[in-house]
């Protein structure tokens, strides 16, 4: 006996104590309802998205750890603008517009999977993704918004989210 890993996809905050999850958990001698409850807590902030969950179980102690892989940046951006797919021609055909604050919120959600050390760097990454799929930000090309972020024009907005970034 050692470490067992179970990989599943669940809708954020909506895992159910049913197959394929329940039998795999039961087989390891864990309380299915408790594990599902913990998975739902861990995935709650991704409500409406399908996320990959890795359940790492120590078969000896029955202790477990839950790792959640957040949705892709593209998925988060598309859902935010209500689009089903990226623009085929993002420079000329826009699929939607988002407020800068929404870009910041997505950056915070993506923190675990981004290599960004600061909120400002994470926001610039998300702005690049928005541009590549045809989304404008506050009615502007995300490239322009990125320049404005670098110039400090959004520092006050970013400061409001700094604490949330640190906790993420």
From Swiss-Prot:
Protein name per the record: Large ribosomal subunit protein uL11
This protein's record includes keyword Hydrolase: no
One GO location term (cellular component): large ribosomal subunit
Family stated for the protein in its record: Belongs to the universal ribosomal protein uL11 family.
HAMAP family: Ribosomal_uL11
Gene Ontology biological process terms, A to Z: translation
InterPro entries linked to this entry: Ribosomal_uL11, Ribosomal_uL11_C, Ribosomal_uL11_C_sf, Ribosomal_uL11_CS, Ribosomal_uL11_N, Ribosomal_uL11_N_sf
Keyword Ribonucleoprotein annotated: yes
One Pfam match: Ribosomal_L11_N
GO molecular function annotation: large ribosomal subunit rRNA binding; structural constituent of ribosome
NCBIfam families in the cross-refs: PRK01143.1
Entry keywords, A to Z: Ribonucleoprotein, Ribosomal protein, RNA-binding, rRNA-binding
Binding partners and assembly: Part of the ribosomal stalk of the 50S ribosomal subunit. Interacts with L10 and the large rRNA to form the base of the stalk. L10 forms an elongated spine to which L12 dimers bind in a sequential fashion forming a multimeric L10(L12)X complex.
UniProt function note: Forms part of the ribosomal stalk which helps the ribosome interact with GTP-bound translation factors.
């Amino acid at each position: 006996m050692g470490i067992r890993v179970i990989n599943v996809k669940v809708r954020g905050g909506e895992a159910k104590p049913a197959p394929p999850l329940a039998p795999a958990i039961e087989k390891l001698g864990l309380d299915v309802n408790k594990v599902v409850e913990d998975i739902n807590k861990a995935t709650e902030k991704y409500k409406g998205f399908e996320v990959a969950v890795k359940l790492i179980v120590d078969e000896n102690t029955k202790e477990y750890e839950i790792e959640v892989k957040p949705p892709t940046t593209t998925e988060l951006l598309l859902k935010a603008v209500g689009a089903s797919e990226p623009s085929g021609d993002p420079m000329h055909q826009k699929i939607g517009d988002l407020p800068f604050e929404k870009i910041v919120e997505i950056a915070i959600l993506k923190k675990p999977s981004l290599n960004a050390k600061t909120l400002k760097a994470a926001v610039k990454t998300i702005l690049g993704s928005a541009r590549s799929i045809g989304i404008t930000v506050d009615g502007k090309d995300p490239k322009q918004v990125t320049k404005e972020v670098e110039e400090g024009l959004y520092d006050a907005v970013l400061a409001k989210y700094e604490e949330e970034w640190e906790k993420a």
